[in-house]
């Protein structure tokens, strides 16, 4: 994953918007700002039906863009980050709607950001993703990435999920309850937090196992290091990646999860303060 951006030679910036929402006004404002720096704004083909701007499929958009803007909420950014890993491209999150943990500023603040950006005043953070290996009953392995989390939960018919977790074929825990969250540090402030999991610093090389509504009083979240791969077995459960992709666990012979070697470059304002964000979002202190 790229460690720096050649901000002096940016030619094209891609843009992907929150789905099913018209953001034409915001797109035109970004185009106007970028034109000052002689940068072309190109769109994902589903981002606008009206605007007369170059439009591309997602793969082509990543290929031709120096980096890509996510205009929406955290969900838009999360799905884009998984794609960005395939093309070694950075992502900038601008929020449109509810404020999240991952997007940094609104379109109204974009002029100030890009003025600083094109002077080299920005920072890049590279959080790690989870690798998920799904092996079907014919032995074919499908690898997926998760930016926030992988959630194993009971289906509608099951009264309780029974989830077994192994490392190197040795069982080290089993969970009875509503489910299990496997979260990245970046995802530790999402579903993991609402299930009383710990907040882990975004750039830590670790991941978290957090039980959901455990039927045991002694089950607690655990933080595991990079290089610690787990195998998860559960019948009649659903595996969900980032709240966006669902798989029936009965369809697979083996499911393994661990912190990936892949990370994604996120562009932030230079003055971004992770702990100040936590303080504001979680109402810490005064």
Swiss-Prot record:
One of its GO terms (cellular component) is cytoplasm. It is an enzyme of class 2 (transferase). The keyword Cytoplasm applies. Keywords: ATP-binding, Cytoplasm, Kinase, NAD, NADP, Nucleotide-binding, Transferase. It catalyses: NAD(+) + ATP = ADP + NADP(+) + H(+). One of its GO terms (biological process) is NAD metabolic process. It holds the Pfam family NAD_kinase_C. Its cofactor is a divalent metal cation. This is NAD kinase. The lineage of its organism: Bacteria, Pseudomonadati, Campylobacterota, Epsilonproteobacteria, Campylobacterales.
């Amino acid at each position: 994953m790229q460690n720096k951006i050649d901000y002096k030679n940016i030619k094209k910036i891609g843009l992907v918007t929150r789905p099913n929402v018209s953001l034409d006004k915001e797109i035109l404002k970004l185009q106007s700002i970028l034109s000052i720096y002689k940068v072309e704004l190109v769109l994902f083909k589903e981002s606008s039906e009206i605007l007369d701007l170059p439009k591309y499929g997602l793969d082509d958009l990543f290929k031709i863009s120096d980096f890509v803007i996510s205009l929406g909420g955290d969900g838009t950014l999360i799905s884009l980050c998984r794609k960005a890993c395939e093309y070694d491209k950075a992502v900038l999150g601008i929020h449109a709607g509810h404020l999240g943990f991952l997007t940094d500023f609104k379109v109204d603040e974009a002029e100030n950001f890009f003025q600083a950006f094109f002077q080299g005043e920005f920072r890049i953070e590279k959080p790690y993703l989870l690798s998920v290996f799904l092996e079907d009953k014919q032995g074919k392995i499908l690898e997926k990435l998760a930016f926030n989390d992988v959630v194993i939960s009971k289906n509608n018919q099951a009264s309780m999920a029974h989830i077994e977790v192994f490392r190197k074929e040795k069982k080290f825990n089993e969970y009875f309850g509503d489910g299990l969250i496997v979260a990245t540090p970046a995802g530790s402030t999402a579903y993991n937090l609402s299930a009383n999991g710990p907040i882990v610093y975004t750039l830590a090389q670790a991941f978290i196992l957090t039980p959901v509504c455990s039927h045991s009083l002694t089950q607690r979240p655990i933080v595991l290091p990079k290089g610690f791969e787990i195998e998860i077995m559960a019948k009649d459960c659903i595996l969900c990646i980032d709240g966006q992709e669902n798989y029936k666990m009965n369809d697979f012979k083996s499911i393994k999860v661990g912190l990936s070697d892949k990370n994604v470059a996120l562009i932030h304002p230079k003055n971004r303060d992770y702990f100040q964000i936590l303080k504001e979002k979680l109402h810490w202190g005064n």
